[in-house]
Amino acid sequence: PQVYKSIFSNDESSVTTHKRKNLTVFFSDIVNFTDLSDSLEPEKLAQIINNYLSEMTTIALECGGTIDKFIGDAVMVFFGDPESMGEEQDALSCIEMALRMKARVEELRKYWIRNGVKGGLDIRVGIATGHCTVGNFGSNQRMDYTALGGPVNISARLEGKAPVNEILISETTNNLVKGQIK
């Protein structure tokens, strides 16, 4: 919604401008999703993944995040563009979102088990903060509003290293929120 407003506000520069901004980037992924996708019928898989992505989208928007993309079962969200509440608050909002998503996944396990997902679903989360280039990237036929840079790569790597159902944050993010997260 934030990007939509920016693009359709008749501000042509918002469509072509690339900016360097400090962002807090979130990556999550469903553990063993490939195995799950191979074991379920397409309709059941679609129902489960669409339910999951809908629930995560609602939380991301409520927390003020910009949903960058879904890559299969992976979710990328960033804070700090197109609107920023300040580096510290952006990092806090991202962590609040991650904690809410983690809690919601735990609540949804019962639903998923009833719908054929043995043991429910588990996620991993990575969060990193730093300077990114953000804007529209792509070709004449297709553009994506996205963030590029070290924090994007770091958050994806942290997600891959996170223990099941846990959140790993970068040192930079930790320094911004130190003492404010329980």
Task: Kindly label every feature range from the protein language model.
Residues 1-20, 106:
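Regulatory cytosolic signal-relay segments
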Residues 13-96:
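Catalytic NTP-binding/metal-coordinating core of nucleotidyl cyclase/transferase enzymes
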Residues 78-89, 125-143, 164-166:
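Catalytic strand-loop-helix junctions within cyclic-nucleotide turnover domains
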Residues 49-65, 81-125, 150-151, 156-159:
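Alpha-helical scaffold within the catalytic cores of cyclic-nucleotide enzymes
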Residues 132-134, 155, 161-182:
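Cytosolic regulatory/linker segments at or just downstream of nucleotide-handling modules
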Residues 4, 33, 76, 173-174:
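A generic structural signal for short hydrophobic patches within well-formed alpha-helices
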Residues 115-117, 137-149:
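Short, surface-exposed loop/helix-turn segments at secondary-structure junctions
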